[in-house]
A protein has these predicted regions:
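Glycine-rich oxoanion-binding loops at beta->alpha junctions
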Residues: 1-7
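Glycine/threonine-rich flexible loop motifs
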Residues: 14-23
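A short helix->loop->beta-strand "cap" motif at the edges of active sites that frequently abuts
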Residues: 27-35
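Short, polar loop motifs at secondary-structure junctions
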Residues: 38-44
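Long, well-ordered, tryptophan-enriched scaffold segments
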Residues: 46-47, 51-197
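A glycine-rich, hydrophobic/aromatic-adjacent loop/helix-cap motif
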Residues: 185, 194-228
């Protein structure tokens, strides 16, 4: 925490639920790290924070989606990181499955061993390589495309990045604010913090998982971290 410019505690009160960790965050704050707490209530850790963002219960995922949309709107997304270190360039067929080389008529020639000790074929994921203007296995791509996909050998595809953009489109600042109770200005500030204000360390707590949409909320927050 002490090496980050900002530390976000999202969905919990570390001072109560993880007392053994709380002092690290407070020591980092004393050393100059901004402490941000996103939680449903103003509790102990929030009282020690530089910025407290109160959010309606079970709407953490919505807040993350709204911040992602604002990042896209401003062109702040970490394009190189998304291209090189995430699944953003992978191609998805209309049936929701990844496009693989076997879909293009290239049968697997290698095998690997799965967790059950069985030999299974290696059928590589496909991306569109902008450098060669061709569909290639992910490992062979120089510059995988993140969008603008035409059908490949008659197969309609989209990148994961395009699907993320589509998923966050409804989450305008106003709609996100209405759902979460977080002000438009705070949503904008959160998006700016994650992308324009230096290193951010996020400590996502178990509070998000206390609702039946907890898994999806966690995935939305993780997506915010990847996009930024």
């Amino acid at each position: 925490a002490i090496n980050a410019k900002h530390h976000v505690i999202w969905g919990g009160d570390t001072a109560v639920s993880q007392k053994q960790l709380a002092h690290f965050f407070l020591e980092a704050r004393d050393a100059g790290t901004e402490l941000v707490v996103i939680d449903i209530a103003y509790r102990t850790m929030a009282s020690k924070s530089d910025w407290f963002i109160p959010v309606h219960p079970a709407t953490d995922g919505a807040l993350a989606l709204g911040a992602i949309r604002e990042i896209f709107e401003q062109g702040w997304e970490a394009t190189d990181f998304l291209r090189d270190h995430t699944e953003a360039p992978l191609l998805i067929k209309e049936d929701g499955m990844f496009l693989r080389m076997s879909d293009l008529g290239v049968e697997p020639t290698e095998t690997t061993t799965n967790a059950q000790g069985q030999e299974i074929p290696v059928d590589p994921y496909v991306v569109w390589d902008e450098a060669s203007s061709s569909a290639v296995p992910l490992a062979q791509a120089t510059k995988p495309a993140l969008g603008g996909m035409a059908p490949i050998e008659g197969i309609a595809v989209r990148t994961e990045m395009e699907m993320i953009r589509e998923a966050v489109e409804p989450w305008t600042l106003e709609h996100t604010s209405e759902v979460t109770g977080v002000s438009v200005e705070d949503i904008q500030h959160l998006a700016h913090l994650y992308t324009q204000e230096g290193d951010v360390q996020t400590d996502m707590k178990f509070g998000l998982n206390h609702y039946n949409n907890g898994m999806y909320s966690s995935k939305c927050v993780n997506s915010l971290l990847l996009v930024s």
